[in-house]
Regions:
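A short, glycine/Asx- and small/polar-enriched loop/turn
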Residues: 63-67, 108-116, 170-171, 259
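Generic secondary-structure signature for well-ordered alpha-helical cores
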Residues: 3-14, 43-46, 61, 93-97, ...
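Helical element adjacent to the flavin cofactor pocket in flavoenzyme catalytic cores
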Residues: 70-134
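C-terminal catalytic lobe of FAD-dependent flavoproteins
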Residues: 80, 90, 145-148, 153-162, ...
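Alpha-helical packing segments of well-folded alpha/beta enzyme cores
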Residues: 4, 8, 83, 87, ...
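Glycine-/small-residue-rich beta->alpha transition segments that form the dinucleotide
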Residues: 123, 132-144, 169, 199-200
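Short loop/edge segments at beta-strand edges and connector loops
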Residues: 52, 100-102, 239
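Dinucleotide-binding Rossmann-like beta1-alpha1 core, especially the glycine-rich loop
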Residues: 1-55, 59, 184-185
Length: 264
């Protein structure tokens, strides 16, 4: 993550706000984990510094005043809309053709070699073929379906995640819970709003296009998020989102929390 962090800050700095971040330990958490966290950060060449809780509250007044420990890290927030648009514009300037509202419905093959794709244009309601010397499967959770067109089997682990967009910006630093990954353990500032996330629930693969945020998920996000920043409990919610993480299955992890986020 820190490698990608540094690359994005270099090539897409106009899409990133350098906020820094805090990993806070609450009374119900173990300070032993803080030491493990700092050691792991140093091993990964991440500058992580334990700071006094009172200093943490001066740096980020929205943080829970009951915190008993804090670690400062070089975090930042990405504007995903601006970054996506910038990525598309840069690709087009380098000769790419961008086809929106197009769905891959098959692969063109010559023996064992993939030579292109069959697509369906939803706007013009037509099917046609695109030929290429290299085809990259970057379809996220739908990558399993694309792979099956080539008679390959990749067992995905659909991990649904829900998050809430708050009505205004309540924090200026990214606030994380310093514990093993769990629901609602990160509060992210972004432009004029803050975002609390996320949950992680395994769903059946045939449900990946049927995303709804449940009342139970909203309750969890508000309840746990208020432990990061108490003012969250009184803050208006603008929107609720749900998506599916494109993880590759791991037999020993029913939640998907520990499944690698690396590229397969």
């Amino acid at each position: 993550c820190i490698e990608e962090n540094r690359i994005l800050k270099r090539i897409a700095h106009h899409c990133i706000e350098r906020t820094d971040g805090l990993f806070i330990t609450l009374p119900q958490d173990s300070l032993d984990y803080q030491q493990q966290f700092i050691a792991a950060c140093r091993q990964a060449d991440i500058n992580a510094e334990a700071i006094d809780p009172q200093l943490a509250l001066r740096l980020e007044p929205a943080a829970n005043p009951a915190l008993i420990g804090a670690v400062r890290v070089p975090d930042g927030t990405v504007d995903p809309f601006r970054l996506t648009a910038a990525n598309m514009l840069d690709a087009r300037e380098h000769g790419a053709q961008i086809l929106t509202y197009h769905q891959v419905v098959g692969l063109l093959r010559s023996g064992d070699r993939v030579t292109g794709v069959r697509v369906y244009d939803h706007q013009n309601q037509r099917r046609y073929e695109l030929h290429a010397s290299v085809v990259v499967n970057a379809a996220g959770i739908w990558g399993q379906q694309i792979a099956e067109y080539a008679d390959l089997r990749i067992r995905m682990f659909p991990a649904k995640g829900a998050l809430l967009i708050l009505g205004h910006r309540i924090n200026n630093m990214v606030i994380n819970r310093c514990r093993k990954p769990a629901d609602a353990d990160i509060l992210v500032p972004g432009d004029t709003i803050s975002l609390i996330g996320t949950t992680s629930t395994h769903i059946d693969y045939d449900q990946i296009d049927n995303m709804l945020v449940t009342p139970q998920e909203v309750d969890i996000l508000i309840r746990e998020g208020a432990l990061l920043a108490p003012t969250l409990a009184q803050t208006r919610i603008l929107r609720a989102y749900a998506g599916v993480r494109p993880l590759v299955a791991s037999d020993d992890d029913p939640s998907g929390r520990n499944v690698s986020r690396g590229i397969v």
